[in-house]
Amino acid sequence: MGFLRVLLLCLLVIRVMVLVGVTGGGAHRPPAMYVFGSSILDVGNNNYLPGAAVGRANRRFNGIDFPASIPTGRFSNGYNIADYVAKNMGFACSPPAYLSLAPNSSGPLVQTALSSGINYASGGAGILDSTKREVHFTPLTLSLSLKDPPEIQNRTACTLQVSIPVKNPPYDSSKWFTRWFSLTWRQRVCGPHVSAKGGRNAGNTIPLSKQVQYFNATRTKMVAAVGPHAATTLLSKSVFLIGIGNNDMFVSAFAEQARNRSAAEQKKDAAALYADLISNYTATMTELHAMGARKFALVGVGLQGCVPGVRALSPAGACWDGLNDLSAGFDAALRTELAGGLSALLPGAAYSLGDCLGFTRDVLADPRASGFDDAAGACCGGGRLSAEAECFPNSTLCADRDRHVFWDRAHFSQRMASLIARAFYDGPAKYTTPISFMQLAQSS
C-alpha cells in the first residue's frame, strides 16, 4: 500500500505539472477552480451539515433536470451558476462539494483539489458570520409545534418555522401569514394542536470565513502532496470563483424595516453596513491571495427585491425597491473598492466582477427577449406566485421550467443560471468589469 501511494502521488505531481504547463498560453482551461459563496454556487455542501435547521436542496423536485433527475443539493432544477462557469472555462464538470470528499482523508480530497478544484460554497452563507444566524425574508420567526391529536397514534410530532414580517409596508403581513400557514399545514401530516413561541431561526451554514479556513486546510495537504512550488504555481493559474452577499442583503433589509428608523438614519446604517461588508470581502480576497490565489471571478449580488419570495409579500406582487436599492448600493461600493485599491492590496492579482444585478434587471425588463414567459413567480413551490412555500416533493411544479426565470422562491432556474454564466464569460462588456471571465481565465 505504501508503494502504491507513493506511485499515485508521483503520477499526480506529473499531472499537475502538465496542467500548469499547458494552461500558461491560454489555449486550455485553468488547472483548477475553487468556489466560495452561498446557495447560488452550492453544489451540495449543505447536505452534509448536521441538524434540522439547515437549508438543503436534497429533495424533489430539486434536480429534476439534472442527469438521472436526482436532487444533488443544488438549489435548482438542474445545474447552477458554478456549474456553468466551470463548463464555460473548459471543465468537464463542476468542482465537487468539499464536504463530500471526506475532508479528513488526504486521498480523494487532494487528488480532486489538484486536478479540478473544490467547491466550498454553502446555502445561507453570508459575507458576515452573523448572517447565518438570521432569517431570510424576515427577522422574526414563530416556531409552531404541531402534535398529533389523541385519535392518531404512532406518529411523530413535527415543527414548522413560520416567518412573519414585523414591519414591512406596504405589505399585508397578516394575510400573507394566513396563506403561508394554511398551505404549509396541508403539506404536513400533523395534527391540529398548535403551540407557538417567538424566536430566531438559528439555521446552520458554512460562513465565508469558515470556507476560507477549509481551503487553507486543503492547500496545506496540496503542498504536502506535490511540494510548495507546484502547488503555488497551480493556484496562481487557477480561478477563484466567489459569489456571496445576497443573504446579507436580505437580513439587513428586513432588520432595517423592523427598526423603523428615519431616512437619514437608514442612509447612515447602509453606509456602516457597506463598510463592514467591504472590509470582510476584501479581507477574504487578501487571505486567499496570501495562500496563492491570483485570479478572482466575482459574482455580484442580485436583484434581491424581485425574487418571488419577496414579491409574494406585496399585494400587487411588486418588487421591493428598498431591498433592490440596498443591493445596488453594496454593488456600487464593491466596484469602487476593487477599482481603486486592488492592485496595491493584492500585487499580481486580477479580477472580473459579474453584474448579476444588472443582468437580472435587463431580463426582467423584457423576459420574452431572453425566452422567458414568467419572470415573477417560482416554478416550484405553492401559493401565490408559487412562492409562499418552499419547493417540496408535493409542491406545484410549472409546466415549462426553461420558461421561468426563477426555480423556487429565492433561486434562479437552471436556464437563467446558464445565461448569467455565459454573459459573464464572453457576453456584452457591460456585464463584467474590468475584463470578462474568459479574459481572466486565459490571462497569464
Task: Provide a role label for each language-model segment.
Residues 2-444:
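Conserved active-site regions of diverse hydrolases
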